[in-house]
Amino acid sequence: DVEGLSYKAGDKYKASAKGKSNQPVCFIDSTGRTYSLPAHTLPSARGQGEPLSGRVSPPSGASFMAAVMGKDKDAYLMSTDAGYGFVVRYADLLANKKAGKTVLNVPKGARVLSPQPIASTADDRIALVSNEGRLLVFPVSELPEMVRGKGNKMMSIPGARVAERVEFVQDVQVVGPDDALTLYAGKRHLTLKAGDLEHYYGERGRRGAKLPRGFQNVDAMSVERKG
């Protein structure tokens, strides 16, 4: 249980990644830069860790947002809460330099969302929920595969509303053909099975359909894998 590990005073759980000790770990910061370190060089879980800033050199004011581990050809969704994203291979996330490299261009006022693993670029779908209670589900195949950039528009949100933090993508997940998607709103949750999700299918770049009352202030989503 990573959230139950021992942390230094003032520290708390942020993100975790599962992998093997002979693999590199990729870290993504708030400016869209990525950094990679050999997993076996990181401190063991018996201690309280060490600052990442001692191993890599992020820009001033940047904060680390996520960590991922995978195989070179594994596909991931890179996106921002401005509603833009693209597909990238794990090998293209890795950076040899201490200063890392820019992979994701972040629009003004937008925030980086955690990379999401894609099992099948042909069959999987992307589910986005906005802070205004709209859900949009469309095929991963409608997004380009890139090594860096801003990506394509996934959900229609005016840039000015993102910059003012009035409207933005609250969360994004990748769902398989038979997967179920659970939405969390306060103490309530709503599970949408594969058939239920069809109501929210739409073309990439649309606004999405309104969720039922009581579930229009979604905090987060999770995927229940089937098969």
Task: Describe the residue ranges of each PLM region.
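Short, structured "edge-of-domain" segments at secondary-structure transitions
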Residues: 1-227
